[in-house]
């Protein structure tokens, strides 16, 4: 547990401008209202569904102790990139978390690059088997991404929500 949290902080610190509270000895970035979080999945086919994003949402709602608004957006690799970007933009999330697999990695990377152009303040996190094995290299390759979730994501996602929530 401690090692995972240490790794989590390293990845966050690598790409975010953060403040340090010397009194509490804690880091924080966001203050204010609850966030709108979009869990995104790019599936191989229209009939497929991404179990990971539903598990993350269910776990966060049950154990997360957060009032952030969490929604799910499922897309397919057959959809036009503009259509996906338009949907994300219409939802106006503060944070976008994307699930990465071998069949959607290049598409997810393109989404990250393009959505950051139209929504520069959006926080982008990615996770899944195609990116969690070497988060540092992924962050170097994708400067638009703010962090990589490693391993089982449920508790890490809750930690992430708390990280951005008011202290």
Predicted regions and their residues:
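Short hydrophobic targeting helices and cationic amphipathic motifs
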Residues: 3, 7-11, 16
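Nucleotide-activated donor-dependent transferases that construct or modify glycoconjugates
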Residues: 36-45
């Amino acid at each position: 547990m401690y090692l995972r949290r240490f790794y989590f902080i390293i990845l966050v610190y690598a790409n975010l401008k953060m403040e340090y509270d010397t009194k509490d000895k804690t880091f924080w970035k966001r203050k204010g209202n609850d966030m709108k979080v979009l869990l995104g999945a790019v599936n191989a086919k229209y009939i497929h569904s991404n179990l990971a994003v539903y598990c993350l949402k269910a776990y966060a709602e049950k154990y997360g102790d957060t009032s952030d608004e969490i929604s799910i957006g499922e897309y397919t690799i057959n959809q036009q990139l503009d259509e996906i970007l338009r949907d994300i933009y219409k939802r106006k999330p503060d944070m976008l978390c994307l699930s990465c697999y071998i069949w959607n990695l290049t598409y997810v990377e393109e989404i990250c690059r393009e959505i950051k152009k139209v929504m520069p303040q959006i926080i982008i996190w990615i996770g899944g088997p195609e990116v969690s094995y070497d988060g540092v290299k992924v962050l170097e390759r994708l400067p638009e991404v703010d962090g990589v979730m490693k391993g089982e994501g449920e508790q890490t996602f809750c930690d992430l929500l708390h990280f951005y929530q008011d202290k």
